[in-house]
A protein has these predicted regions:
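Membrane-embedded alpha-helical segments of integral membrane proteins
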Residues: 89-137
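Internal/C-terminal transmembrane anchor helices
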Residues: 142-169
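Conserved HGGG/HGGXW glycine-rich cap/lid loop of the alpha/beta-hydrolase fold
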Residues: 197-241
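Conserved serine/cysteine hydrolase catalytic core
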Residues: 334-403, 425
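Flexible "cap/lid" loop of the alpha/beta hydrolase fold
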Residues: 296-325
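Catalytic active-site module of serine/aspartate enzymes centered on a nucleophile-bearing elbow/loop
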Residues: 6-28, 396-437
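Active-site loop/oxyanion-hole signature of alpha/beta-hydrolase fold enzymes
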Residues: 236-270
Length: 437
């Protein structure tokens, strides 16, 4: 073999070895980026479903941020120790998210403060994302890294934009303006929202269902019933425009009692509850029997029903955080109000449900006080019809009506079906009037 050929072959082998040696740290760098980001995601999920499951929105959000901070910190540390292209810039998002997360968990701000912070964190997060992109581009060690990092940057940017839009929409949407005649009444440390229309006695009090606010009952039912008597739609604590209070040990019956007294709403009352609201109606009737002249249960839950949310209830606490970045708006009806508020209401009701079902179970009979049970005829879960039949036995004066083509929600949301709910309420009002002479 000629010397030139041997020299050429040696040069080729040397280049191949050099290329392979160069690709090894590049592959290692890509693995570190991917594994660090994945570790951050896994840590966030573990914190949310583990030690902080079922926590308040501020705690859940803080746990997620701490998990993400772990991922960015790993990227900064491992890239410095194990690669020739250290990603020291990752220490900045790690520190920012760790500080924000720890602050949320320690201070545990309420919904009002989190809403106010909605004007602050989206632009800060967007600025951080831009800064991260600029510095990450300078430290790229392979063509693989951009495909690993840029989707993460994109998700963070979308969260910032979504959070900003959600805050702006909640503050400016004319459809969410306060309805004339709505009052905020102090019931002892917090205020409840109530709006009464119509005239006459007995007064009808509308109890919204699971995750619902007074607006749901006031859309079709309240105006119809107002033609017959006085009707009041109110928001329980933490719902609609009412102030939030800790869910643990919350006494809804006491709140309503004080609200009606301080708002100068005269009794006796016909309490009409939809879904979970039916359980609040029964609890109130048990606690203040002399004030309740009649009850209407609109496809109500049953005190002894299986709690379908018992298993995932603690995991549902992540919903308000997702709503805060605009995800709930994608799946919600714009007419129903603020998705962020709805999400918090839903989680609060789910957490309160076991205690509320137990309180409702204390009422074993309404005696001869008129009762109307309205049942949706479609899309009901197994055993629902039997539970509705059992509710109808609570009074010796009962009307049980099934709306064949109605669903659980259409009894209050569909105009035609809501009219039948309104009719059932008005019928009980007339029955009470006949009894009182």
């Amino acid at each position: 073999m000629q010397p030139d050929a041997v020299s050429y072959q040696g040069e080729v082998v040397t280049r191949r070895r050099a290329g392979a040696a160069q690709r090894r740290p590049q592959r290692r760098s890509a693995v570190i980026v991917a594994s660090s980001l994945l570790a951050g995601l896994v840590t966030a999920i573990a914190l949310v479903v583990g030690p902080f499951a079922g926590g308040r929105e501020s705690v859940i959000t803080g746990a997620i941020l701490l998990g993400f901070a772990v991922g960015w910190a790993l990227l900064a540390v491992l890239s410095v120790r194990l690669t020739d292209r250290p990603q020291r810039w990752a220490a900045v998002p790690a520190a920012a998210m760790a500080i924000a997360g720890a602050g949320l968990m320690v201070l545990a701000p309420g919904v009002a403060v989190l809403t106010a912070l909605g004007w602050v964190w989206p632009p800060l997060l967007l600025a951080l994302v831009v800064w991260m992109i600029v510095h990450a581009r300078r430290r790229q060690s392979s063509r693989v890294q951009p495909w690993l990092l840029y989707p993460v940057f994109g998700v963070l940017a979308l969260a910032a934009v979504g959070g900003g839009y959600e805050t702006l929409r909640n503050a400016t949407d004319p459809a969410l303006a306060q309805v004339a005649g709505t009052r905020l009444v102090d019931v002892g440390g917090h205020r409840l929202s109530i709006r009464c229309t119509g005239s006459g006695s007995p007064t009808v009090v509308l109890e919204p269902g699971l995750g619902e606010s007074a607006a749901a009952m006031a859309r079709w039912i309240a105006p119809d019933v107002a033609r017959t008597t006085t009707v009041c739609a109110y928001d329980r604590a933490g719902h609609g425009r009412s102030d939030a209070v800790p869910a643990n040990g919350y006494d809804a019956a006491r709140d309503l009692h004080v609200l009606l007294k301080r708002a100068h709403v005269p009794g006796p009352y016909v309490i009409a509850g939809h879904s979970l609201g039916g359980m609040f109606a029964l609890s109130y009737a048990h606690r203040y029997p002399a004030q309740v002249a009649g009850v209407v249960l609109l496809d109500s839950m049953h005190p002894h029903q299986d709690n379908a949310f018992a298993g995932p209830a603690r995991l549902l606490a992540v919903i308000p955080t997702l709503a805060r970045i605009g995800l709930a708006r994608v799946f919600s009806d714009p007419k129903d109000g603020k998705p962020t508020t709805q999400a918090a209401q839903f989680v609060r009701d789910v957490n309160e449900m076991p205690a509320q079902l137990n309180r409702a179970a204390n009422l074993t009979s309404l005696g001869d006080r008129p009762l109307s049970v309205v049942t949706a005829g479609t899309d009901s879960p197994a055993g629902w019809t039997a539970e509705q039949n059992d509710l109808a036995t609570l009074s010796s004066i009962t009307v049980h009506h099934t709306v064949a083509d109605a669903t659980h929600t259409s009894l209050i949301e569909d105009k035609r079906h809501a009219a039948q709910s309104s009719q059932a309420i008005s019928d009980i009002v007339r029955a009470v009037r006949r009894r009182s002479g």
